[in-house]
Design a protein with these regions (language model features):
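Short, active-site-adjacent cap segments at secondary-structure transitions
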Residues: 15-17, 81-84
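Homeobox/homeodomain signature
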Residues: 2, 6-9, 31, 82-84, ...
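N-terminal short beta-loop-beta anion/metal-coordinating cradle
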Residues: 1-69
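Mid-sequence, gly/pro-rich, charge-dense loop/helix-turn segments that line enzyme active sites
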Residues: 83-131
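Proline-aspartate-enriched helix->loop->beta-strand connector
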Residues: 70-75
Length: 131
């Protein structure tokens, strides 16, 4: 299966610096204040962009990336705000479920992490797309 161009987002410059430095045929384009770095990593055409910290920044940046560059897949790289013990720098983590750990609707009867859909007594877990 081929995904064509791949989009890669990272919250901070340090999360993208090595990838940007490795780009062949690099170019830059600014869209809505976001600096997109285009080029090739190996045989793959890529678009790299720093989105800023937080899920709203990531969502906004991802939508601009999709609208302007139409990547076949989007990868989020970086530290991902790791909360699990036992992880070391350089470990690769692949999610099998996504929870908004910072969402708290407890004042209206939902447990922390529940986004007011489904069971109000359990966090809402979103399954990632299979690759």
């Amino acid at each position: 299966m081929s995904y064509g161009r791949i989009g890669v987002i990272g919250a901070m410059d340090s999360e993208l610096a090595a990838l940007i430095a490795a780009l062949a045929q690099p170019a830059q384009e600014t869209v809505q204040g976001l600096v997109f770095h285009t080029g090739r990593l190996g045989v793959r055409e890529v678009v790299l962009v720093r989105c800023g910290i937080g899920k709203v920044s990531a969502a906004r940046c991802t939508q601009v990336l999709i609208d302007r560059f139409a990547p076949g897949a989007v990868i989020n790289t970086g530290i991902a705000g790791g909360l699990a013990g036992g992880l070391a720098v350089g470990d690769i983590v692949v999610a099998d479920g996504l929870v908004q750990h910072d969402f708290d609707a407890a004042p209206i009867g939902f447990v922390r992490g529940c986004v007011c859909m489904g069971d109000p007594g359990a966090p809402t877990v979103f399954a990632p797309d299979a690759v």
